[in-house]
């Protein structure tokens, strides 16, 4: 476990993800036309957890994909270091779908902007909604989450770590000073 204060333990993470799943269903009136896309890597694991809950509640399959934002980051324009580019896997059409973009922590909004650019390169969804496990504030762009597990005001020096077990299930959320 990372050093710091546990702000969500395993049970709290499970409750937050279940609540997010219910909120997604309520906002979208079910799962028809709904797809989830997780941002690599933590968002992918959380998207799969949310999809499992959606499918359990609704008894219907919900497509889930993953997006890598490396090539869309605005902090590397023109001078990109040699970063490993991960896999984007969206094995379904996004055209006219309601996309729920999933990430672990919302901070400045730049990761979300990059992910939206990547999604738009794969098609034109009817809408994009955002689900995050933790919103820590400090936005640099006008982006807000539609579904939030926990709002955690932080200082710029603090970090939020979402921890996962060996099976990539979220276990704890830790505030690191």
From Swiss-Prot:
Report the domain of life of the source organism: Bacteria
Its recorded reaction(s) are: UMP + diphosphate = 5-phospho-alpha-D-ribose 1-diphosphate + uracil
The listed location of motif PRPP-binding is 99-111
**Gene3D superfamilies per the UniProt record, alphabetical:** 3.40.50.2020
Keyword Metal-binding among record annotations: no
Which GO molecular function terms does the record list? uracil phosphoribosyltransferase activity
> Record's InterPro entries?
PRibTrfase_dom (IPR000836), PRTase-like (IPR029057), PyrR (IPR023050), PyrR_bifunctional (IPR050137)
Q: What is its EC number?
A: 2.4.2.9
Task: Show the Pfam families listed in the entry.
Answer: Pribosyltran
Write down the top EC class of this protein.
transferase
Q: What keywords sit in the KW lines?
A: Glycosyltransferase, Transcription, Transcription regulation, Transferase
Enumerate the Gene Ontology biological process terms: regulation of DNA-templated transcription
Family of this protein: Belongs to the purine/pyrimidine phosphoribosyltransferase family. PyrR subfamily.
Instruction: Give the matching HAMAP family.
Output: PyrR
State the protein's purpose.
Answer: Regulates the transcription of the pyrimidine nucleotide (pyr) operon in response to exogenous pyrimidines.
What protein does this entry describe? Bifunctional protein PyrR
């Amino acid at each position: 476990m990372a050093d710091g204060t546990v702000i969500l333990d395993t049970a709290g993470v499970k409750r937050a993800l279940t609540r997010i799943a219910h909120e997604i269903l309520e906002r979208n009136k079910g799962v028809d036309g709904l797809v989830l896309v997780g941002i690599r890597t933590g968002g992918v694991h959380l998207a799969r957890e949310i999809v499992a809950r959606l499918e359990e509640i609704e008894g219907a399959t919900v497509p889930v994909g993953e997006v890598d934002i490396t090539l869309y980051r605005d902090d590397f324009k023109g001078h990109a270091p040699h970063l490993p580019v991960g896999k984007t896997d969206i094995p379904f059409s996004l055209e006219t779908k309601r996309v729920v973009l999933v990430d672990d922590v919302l901070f400045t909004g730049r990761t979300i902007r990059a992910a939206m650019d990547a999604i738009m390169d794969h098609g034109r969804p009817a809408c994009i909604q955002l689900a995050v496990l933790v919103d820590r504030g400090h936005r640099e762009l006008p982006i807000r989450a539609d579904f939030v597990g926990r709002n955690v005001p932080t200082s710029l020096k603090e970090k939020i770590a979402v921890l996962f077990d060996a099976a990539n299930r979220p276990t704890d959320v830790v505030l690191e000073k």
